[in-house]
Design a protein with these regions (language model features):
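Short, glycine/charge-rich flexible loops or terminal/linker lids adjacent to PRPP-binding catalytic cores
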Residues: 219-267, 278, 305-315
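Acidic, divalent-metal-coordinating active-site segment for phosphoryl/phosphodiester hydrolysis
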Residues: 10-17, 275-276, 280
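Conserved short alpha-helical segments that host acidic/polar catalytic motifs at enzyme active sites
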Residues: 39, 46, 50-131, 136-201, ...
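PRPP-dependent phosphoribosyltransferase catalytic core
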Residues: 64-66, 81-83, 88, 100, ...
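CoA-thioester-processing core
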Residues: 1-7, 20-21, 36-41
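C-terminal long alpha-helix characteristic of the crotonase
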Residues: 15, 24-49
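Phosphate/diphosphate-binding loops
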Residues: 60-64, 116-117, 121-125, 129-133, ...
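Extended, hydrophobic alpha-helical segments in both membrane/secreted and soluble proteins
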Residues: 203-206, 210-217, 221, 225, ...
Length: 410
């Protein structure tokens, strides 16, 4: 079987289109090409004999990708004429899970980032791809796996459980929904311990990901839980939208307050996290306009004080509302009567409560501890400078960070 260069352009290019574009057996520089996939193609070309692939050759290429590509990645690549290869970074930051389906003709396999994709197709979860592991499913349906990293450890990104993942998914053996319920329990404990003077009449979630935490928080406080905002399904995630004015306008278009749930009440709004603060500030104002007497705000996550460089398009530190402010100052910026953040250790405990086997997490956006050990202040400054330049020129700032996040080392 002859090796072909792997191509990735945030979509799929088949062999016919690749031939038409003159892309076969060479790497074509393109914006936002995934460095890890390009390195994989390059390494397979180097290790193959006369451009012919076999299972050992493919597995032999992965350790060099792990060595040369720093950071977080979970890759699923289709190798034309051979099969599907999946591998995960040695730190296990980004998730990858294997599913299977038993049929009359044999066992079928699939790999996805979340178990919900496996469930929705009628497959069953087999297991997670281990950090540093590669999994290969050939065209005949044979399943192979190999640990390709000499050193590996599981450090799942805790922001997956806070916000990114769907609540009906399992990530590294932990139910996202149960983890968010536990986050609400921890928040309730903190409020009863440190904010017992707050006279909360009702708990209202900011749709959608904060609902489980808000529900459990209300139960823990013994106050009613109400849906106070109706969400439009046509507006995307506001914290990754470019431009402050666009984000502010999008919040109003995305959410509409139900006045009867706010009028004359002391409301406790609950969100999964506070990033820039644009959404939270607008929502606090909307609650007041709907008639709330007092507006308290609770975050199921700790203050986001540092940028994420492991695959989340998070703002630079200068754009993070909590980066250089105390919690009291953030509350003032939001216009809230009180602000309650989750403690980082409580957040970790909430996820461990669901799966005690998870002992370490990637938490850099909260504590500035970048577990790969190679993220320097100069690197963070380079990201910020490039994003600022992209924003000033009107280019896509998201791409500016993506190019820098996927760093290849010689």
């Amino acid at each position: 079987r002859k090796a072909k260069e792997l191509l990735f352009t945030a979509g799929v290019i088949d062999a016919i289109e690749a031939h038409r574009l003159g892309m076969v057996n060479r790497v074509v520089p393109r914006d936002k090409l995934e460095v890890s996939v390009l390195k994989l193609a390059h390494e397979m070309s180097k290790t193959s004999v006369k451009l012919r692939l076999d299972t050992p050759t493919i597995f032999a290429a992965v350790p060099n990708v792990d060595r040369r590509c720093r950071g977080a990645y979970a890759v699923v690549a289709m190798i034309a004429g051979y099969g599907v290869l999946a591998f995960r970074d040695p730190y296990g930051i980004r998730p990858a899970v294997i599913g299977y389906n038993e049929t009359e003709s044999g066992v079928e396999y699939m790999v996805a980032s979340e178990s919900v994709a496996i469930d929705s197709l009628g497959f069953r979860v087999l297991r997670d791809v281990a950090p540093g592991e590669a999994v290969l499913i050939d065209e005949d349906g044979n399943f192979y796996s190999q640990q390709c990293a000499p050193r590996s450890s599981l450090n799942p990104c805790i922001f997956e459980y806070v916000y990114l993942a769907r609540p009906d998914s399992l990530i590294d053996g932990a139910s996202v929904y149960e983890a968010r319920l536990a986050m609400g329990e921890k928040l309730a404990e903190k409020i009863k311990r440190e904010y017992h003077h707050l006279d909360v009449d009702v708990v209202i979630p900011i749709p959608d990901s904060s609902r489980p935490s808000a529900l459990q928080l209300a139960l823990g406080l013994g106050v009613p839980y109400r849906e106070g905002f109706v969400k439009s399904r046509y507006i995307g995630r506001t914290f990754i939208m470019p431009g402050h004015a666009v984000r502010r306008r999008s919040v109003r278009q995305k959410l509409n307050a139900i006045s009867m749930e706010f009028k004359g009440k002391n409301v406790l709004l609950v969100d999964d996290s506070i990033v820039r603060g644009t959404t939270s500030r607008e929502i606090v104002q909307m609650a007041r306009e709907a008639g709330a007497r007092k507006v308290f705000f609770a975050s199921a996550a700790p203050p986001v004080r540092f940028p994420n460089v492991y695959g989340i398009d998070m703002p630079t530190r200068a754009e993070l509302i909590a980066a250089h402010r105390s919690e009291e100052e953030v509350a003032t910026e939001l216009g809230a009567d009180a602000l309650i953040y989750q403690d980082l250790e409580a957040l970790k405990s909430a996820v461990r409560q669901v799966n005690p086997m998870l002992t370490r997490f990637e938490t850099s956006c909260f504590d500035g501890n970048y577990i790969t050990g190679d993220v320097t202040s100069d690197y963070l400054l380079a990201i910020e400078t490039r994003r600022d330049a992209a924003r000033d020129s009107g280019d896509d700032a998201e791409g500016a960070q993506l190019d820098l996040n996927l760093v290849a080392a010689d």
